């Protein structure tokens, strides 16, 4: 049998199962979505009134949710004044949350003051991973916890793709390598209790449950098809940021980028031996 005949026979066989294959692909794999991070916090059973720091809080959505859902005393920290001002407006009256200017490497809190650090989708922007995780260790109480969500490049991300994407998104190349981050965690004396590889979990969740937020592939196609249309109206820098954001979401879906959730703990006593790696698991 020739190679061409073998290919044709393979396609003939595929035709027999194509409909069944498509039906199976249309069945959900049960993605958990980002709300699963709050489930991780719930599992920690921290008491109401626990002090929680939202590092890189943006406009305050997660900080307010942590305060209202769990009754935590939350301090949201962000380096951007506009975000901090917006976060203060978001917080409802009586909500136990405050916001302040600061960075992951210089948090405006005393040492040993926090029960939990929450940091989602921020540390890819931070070149000084050692400084950030050392600061987390400083601020955490003995036995304090951290929930970190960070996105990394995989071996599927081509050098040319990275050369555009990382500057457009303001990311540090070294921070996009998990080995850099895990070395920083260990150097800081924090323990990795659990490492959760998200893969496409969150992207699938949004596709299934919030489809109106999932136009990234279509938008990327339009941006690439007629760049001058959008550059002329919005400027080259804004064009690059928008294209980068669209590609970021697409790359997360197809495995060129992959997020991880780290559940960390500080030693129970000052001066305890260094950390050891904890367990790894897939999914959200």
Language-model features, listed with the residues they occupy:
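N-terminal, positively charged/glycine-rich alpha-helical extensions of SAM-dependent methyltransferases
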Residues: 1-20
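Conserved SAM-binding loop and adjacent beta-strand
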Residues: 21-38
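A conserved beta-strand element that flanks and buttresses the S-adenosyl-L-methionine
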Residues: 118
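Conserved Class I S-adenosyl-L-methionine
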Residues: 196-284
